[in-house]
Amino acid sequence: MTDTAARVAVCQAYLDGLVAGDLDAVLSLFADDATVEDPVGTEPKVGREALAAFYQIACDFVTAAQLTGTPRVAGDEVAFPFEITTGTGDKASIISIIDVFRFNEAGKIVSMRAWWGGDNVRPA
């Protein structure tokens, strides 16, 4: 598998892990010292413990996720547009997001930045 194909596969594995509520699967994609800035402009979460706390919430609330366009790979980074559905019933929302992952030489995510804001959230 090429680096490009492997990085695109990580995008799908990330979404699959969120929907499955599989915290271990999501965390396995990240380096131990990775950072997550979600959304961009918030205080980054740094390291395995902070990521576990953040992603536990995501794994508990994401009910669906899908790519909404083709991931773009450049160098050691990939940008990809997707939507997640959170909550159920009349509390369900859809959030349109663009994530950028940066990878280390081992193919682990070392940085994740998520571009989204209030204008990107709508009722499901």
Describe each model-derived feature in a short phrase.
Residues 1-32, 123-124:
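Short, low-complexity N-terminal intrinsically disordered segments enriched in polar/charged residues
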Residues 2-3, 52-124:
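A beta-strand edge to alpha-helix "cap/lid" segment located at domain peripheries
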Residues 7-11, 26, 38, 52, ...:
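A generic structural signal for ordered secondary structure
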Residues 23-75:
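A solvent-exposed, acidic/Ser-Thr-rich amphipathic alpha-helical stretch
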